[in-house]
Amino acid sequence: MRIGLVGAGNIAGRYAAAIAAAGELELAGVTDTASGRAEALAAEHDCVVHPSLAALLADDGVDTVVNLTVPQAHADVTAAALEAGKHVHSEKPLALRHEDARRLVELAADRGVRLSSAPATLLGEAQQTAWKLVREGAIGRVRAVYAEANWDRLERWHPDPRSLYEVGPLVDVGSYPLAILTAMFGPVRRAQAYATTLEPQRTLLDGTPFTPGAPDFVVAVLEHADGVVTRLTASFYVGPCRQRGLELHGDTGSLHLPTWAEADSGLFVQGRGGDYEQQPLLREPFPGIDWARALVDLADAIATGRPHRSSGEHAAHVVEVLEAVEGSVATAAPVDVGSDFARPEPLEWAR
């Protein structure tokens, strides 16, 4: 699968390296609106630099676009790529509004191309092992989940995180555990939430002050179709430490993933009243995050005609959940969620 990157910012290098390491994938081109960024990435990874999005989309040597632009541009860039007949994998969120996300899903179907979206951390070894244990009843019926998405103060390391502070931690990192949990326990049907800004004045590494455009602390209670209740916390104030994991609590025990992000997370199970014990993963895990895993799955799905796992429909549902949380914050009332999606299949080695 020949890939064109749109956006050569903070995570583009990680995608490019992962694509290079995957035999099924080829980095065919890159474009970026910021002068010099695409050229630097292309020099390191030996690919074509396109002077514009239009030029990349006109290149027959690119069949799949990976959208790595800022969240505010995701919907427009993805729509342009789909209109051009390209398959698309978008960084999260698929769009900032559910209406736009649904429109992208419909456009992909109309054009006969695939629409995939991050996050794809569900495909990691630790996450797949946890899902298998849940399906097999290792902790009984799951009724409650604690999900932590605390990402500290991005301005301490990110060169310019202002676009991320405009959408806030709910959208930027809350979508990761949401994608995993909705795959495991089905769509969310109702959301109720609280949010505030803990640190209203921030400063970039170069000394430039800025003000976040969205709350930097969000707590949401989500009711899933399967009856599970999730408490999700997302923050750009609290550091991760032990605050970046998933706890699944069932009738006969509990399961803990210290991090939902990395494929090589530890995995611990506690029987009722017992101690947490580390569990073996189903296979040797990838170290950290495999940024190309959803792309490898997409390439295989296109080649074999099966559904890909990180689907646009699933991503659009996550967008509606995020929108419902924001609506609940604004109204101080519960907000219903109506969309659905076909749940992904476990990976072959995790069935």
For the regions a language model picked out, list residue spans one by one.
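N-terminal Rossmann-like dinucleotide-binding module
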Residues: 1-45
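Predominantly a Rossmann-like dinucleotide-binding segment in NAD(P)-dependent oxidoreductases
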Residues: 121-211, 332
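Beta-strand-loop-alpha-helix segment that lines the small-molecule cofactor/substrate pocket
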Residues: 64, 70-71, 75-122, 137
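Active-site loop of classical SDR/Rossmann-like NAD(P)-dependent oxidoreductases
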Residues: 33, 285-295
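Conserved SAM-binding strand-loop segment of SAM-dependent methyltransferases
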Residues: 46-53
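Hydrophobic residues in well-ordered beta-strands that form the structural core
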Residues: 51, 67, 89-90, 115-117, ...
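Contiguous beta-strand/loop segments that form the cofactor/metal-binding neighborhood of enzyme cores
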Residues: 179-263, 292-306, 340-351
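C-terminal helix-rich "cap/oligomerization" subdomain common to oxidoreductases
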Residues: 64-66, 102, 297-351
